[in-house]
Amino acid sequence: MKCVDLFSGCGGLSLGFELAGFEICAAFENWEKAIEIYKNNFSHPIYNIDLRNEKEAVEKIKKYSPDLIMGGPPCQDFSSAGKRDISLGRADLTYSFANIVCNIRPKWFVMENVEQIKKSHILQDIINQFIDFGYGLTSAILDASYCGVPQSRTRFSLIGKLNSEHNFLIPTLSRKLSDKPMTVRDYLGNSLNLEFYYRHPRNYNRRGIFSIDEPSPTIRGVNRPIPKGYNINSCDPKGVELAKVRPLTTIERSYIQTFPKSFLFSGTKTDLEQMIGNAVPVNLAKFVASAIINFEKEPIRSMG
């Protein structure tokens, strides 16, 4: 199936869908640093467009006649990782995503976002819009560690299919979930040459040290060194030698996001940390894409 990626960032969603067997025709993004990385890793075009300009976007997307439109509208207005202030103006891009999809009416769409979007009236607004335009909807909160990602990262997915019943994809998604969460060691073995690592907590009441024998916490857009005189938190693993603890490097964090070692990253540390932290984990995207492909291959169900 042919698809286009809106708000593509550096390409986590694109790569996951490509690995699952989709043909990515084009991507759309307006952060130049992310566009440069995307171009270095994909052969199809990427357009530098502010998707608030819906007319221009629709004209370009229609040329590709996509079977599926996917995207993760910027989520800072919903995310607990940043200021949750819808007045800041990023949330209107969620409406732009819905407007573009409903104008083009591909057979499928996938919208990916943070779990907190469920608390926003915007989600109900666009759900009503999609239903009015004939989409059956499946919404799911997926823990990436059960979807082939060594990271406890919960994300919200809204998946639409024209002329379908609601919740149509739930059985397929459920069958594909792993029985247990994936740990860092499960995914990377001993290649990190460490047993414990530091992830800077949002506040010092939370743990900062993690074992590779558990899923990583959410990879965020910042990465800081362990402070001098770090006080062991009661929830940190017991018996850890602080002298042997370090934060993961930028590229190691991309591995936790399941970008392959062959994926080319370049740029400043600050930009890369933000790009990698904002990306949809590649294997989570592949998980959703594979569920769609499997659903398409299943025998036609009786409507009776």
Curated annotation (Swiss-Prot):
InterPro entries listed in its UniProt record: C5-Methyltransferase, C5_DNA_meth_AS, C5_MeTfrase, C5_meth_CS, SAM-dependent_MTases_sf
Single GO BP term: DNA restriction-modification system
Q: Which residues form the SAM-dependent MTase C5-type domain?
A: 1-299
Q: Which domain of life is it from?
A: Bacteria
Q: Please tell me which top-level EC class this enzyme sits in.
A: transferase
Query: What's its EC?
Result: 2.1.1.37
Q: Which residues form the active site?
A: 75
Q: Does the entry feature the keyword DNA-binding, yes or no?
A: yes
Which reactions appear under catalytic activity for this entry? a 2'-deoxycytidine in DNA + S-adenosyl-L-methionine = a 5-methyl-2'-deoxycytidine in DNA + S-adenosyl-L-homocysteine + H(+)
Against SUPFAM superfamilies, the record matches this protein to:
S-adenosyl-L-methionine-dependent methyltransferases
Q: Which UniProt keywords apply?
A: DNA-binding, Methyltransferase, Restriction system, S-adenosyl-L-methionine, Transferase
Q: Which molecular function terms from Gene Ontology are attached?
A: DNA (cytosine-5-)-methyltransferase activity; DNA binding
Q: Which Pfam families match?
A: DNA_methylase
Q: Which family does it belong to?
A: Belongs to the class I-like SAM-binding methyltransferase superfamily. C5-methyltransferase family.
What this chain does, per the record? Answer: A methylase, recognizes the double-stranded sequence 5'-GRCGYC-3', methylates C-? on both strands, and protects the DNA from cleavage by the HindV endonuclease.
Protein name in the entry: Type II methyltransferase M.HindV
Query: What organism is the protein native to?
Result: Haemophilus influenzae (strain ATCC 51907 / DSM 11121 / KW20 / Rd)
